[in-house]
């Protein structure tokens, strides 16, 4: 399969949900097109990476465990408004949809038209789902519009300025008392072989990921933020972390 890098892709209005209320154009960021075109923005990327076994392999067999740890934070049944930031390869969204109660609704956003199209294709039941092209660092939702927000393996793919804005936006759109759930990379313990195995992998393929080894996710919260609680747990020898912020 041949991958040929293309230029920046602008918003494809035909892929946006008609009820999104999106009023401004969304453009794929330059950093994403330059750094991750092979994984997210190229049309052939989906054909390569949208394989459950592959995303599980990339996470060293931990995909299902980390997925379930994130979703358990939202409860067995979700009756509120939940936001998934970025489409995510694998069956993460399908499992989230299964938790939606009669009054639950899921908004899924992604900046890449290729990912929006893929999400439409892989979700068979979209009755309680809106799939919207939006920039995570400049969301077009009202303040305090969601009961919970989940950000699954996205922060490590962002330069620090975009990451900081995305964390602030996730906080902004969450209702007081609601949860923001982050799952991402973390610095492994010194005794873990992945402390050494992952360095060349991440520095080669994920140039922003080492930030998650060097700083806490809470480091990127906006100054003066008001949070009730911040909880952190690590997994698989410390290579992965779950951070739950209660707004």
Label each residue range with its predicted role.
Residues 37, 164, 181-239:
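C-terminal alpha-helical "lid/dimerization" subdomain adjacent to the S-adenosyl-L-methionine
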Residues 58-78, 95:
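Conserved alpha-helix/loop element of class I SAM-dependent methyltransferases that forms part
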Residues 1-51:
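N-terminal, positively charged/glycine-rich alpha-helical extensions of SAM-dependent methyltransferases
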Residues 137-149:
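A short acidic, Gly/Pro-enriched loop at the edge of an enzyme's catalytic core
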Residues 81-138:
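Class I SAM-dependent methyltransferase SAM/SAH-binding core
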Residues 79, 102-103, 174-179:
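Short glycine-dipeptide loop
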Residues 147-161:
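A short SAM/SAH-binding and catalytic strip from SAM-dependent methyltransferases
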Residues 164-176:
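A short glycine-rich, Lys/Arg-flanked "PGG" loop and its adjoining helix->strand segment in the class I
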